[in-house]
Amino acid sequence: MRMSTTTEIIAHHWAFAVFLIGAVGLCGLMLLGAYFLGGRAQARAKNVPYESGIDSVGSARMRLSAKFYLVAMFFVIFDVEALYLYAWSISIRESGWIGFIEAVIFILVLLAGLFYLVRIGALDWTPTRSNRRVSKPSTVRYASSHPQDISQELSVAGSQQANESR
């Protein structure tokens, strides 16, 4: 006797359906428990950040550079790609040359993306150059710490000033 297709589908997927119902039910139970059992304090200090018993000073909003966000995104992207390469390396015997060629193309696309990121400066952490021109440094003579050299430099400087004043 052959089972109908709906019975086969139910028999095949019942465990996954029970898992989904259990996960959604557990999330709902935790949310309802927090709603009914949670405190309801409505004071002025409720919306003030708590800092280890110390009154906070200044703004709690700290500006982060977008570079940190970019690095996090690059990490996630390249980490997922490493996961794909790991899965490919496990099934390399079954995939054969076609799988190898696909992996090489995948790696080349990764390298092209990395090259593009380097080219646009997304991975460059040095500050950008300003367009200001730096003036040519003037010649400054530094006196040495030896007393004999200091007296010689003073006498040379004094004679130069005397010559300029004439």
From Swiss-Prot:
The chain crosses the membrane at residues 16-36, 68-88, 98-118. Residues 141-166 are annotated as: Disordered. GO terms for molecular function: NADH dehydrogenase (ubiquinone) activity; NADH:ubiquinone reductase (non-electrogenic) activity; quinone binding. It is found in: Cell inner membrane. Disulfide bonds: none annotated. One of its GO terms (cellular component) is plasma membrane. Its EC number is 7.1.1.-. The keyword DNA damage does not apply. Keywords: Cell inner membrane, Cell membrane, Membrane, NAD, Quinone, Translocase, Transmembrane, Transmembrane helix, Transport, Ubiquinone. It is an enzyme of class 7 (translocase). Pfam families: Oxidored_q4. It is a multi-pass membrane protein. It catalyses: a quinone + NADH + 5 H(+)(in) = a quinol + NAD(+) + 4 H(+)(out). Gene3D superfamilies: NADH:ubiquinone/plastoquinone oxidoreductase, chain 3. NDH-1 shuttles electrons from NADH, via FMN and iron-sulfur (Fe-S) centers, to quinones in the respiratory chain. The immediate electron acceptor for the enzyme in this species is believed to be ubiquinone. Couples the redox reaction to proton translocation (for every two electrons transferred, four hydrogen ions are translocated across the cytoplasmic membrane), and thus conserves the redox energy in a proton gradient. Belongs to the complex I subunit 3 family. NDH-1 is composed of 13 different subunits. Subunits NuoA, H, J, K, L, M, N constitute the membrane sector of the complex. PANTHER family: NADH-QUINONE OXIDOREDUCTASE SUBUNIT A (PTHR11058:SF21), NADH-UBIQUINONE OXIDOREDUCTASE CHAIN 3 (PTHR11058). This is NADH-quinone oxidoreductase subunit A. It comes from Yersinia pseudotuberculosis serotype IB (strain PB1/+). The lineage of its organism: Bacteria, Pseudomonadati, Pseudomonadota, Gammaproteobacteria, Enterobacterales. The gene is nuoA.
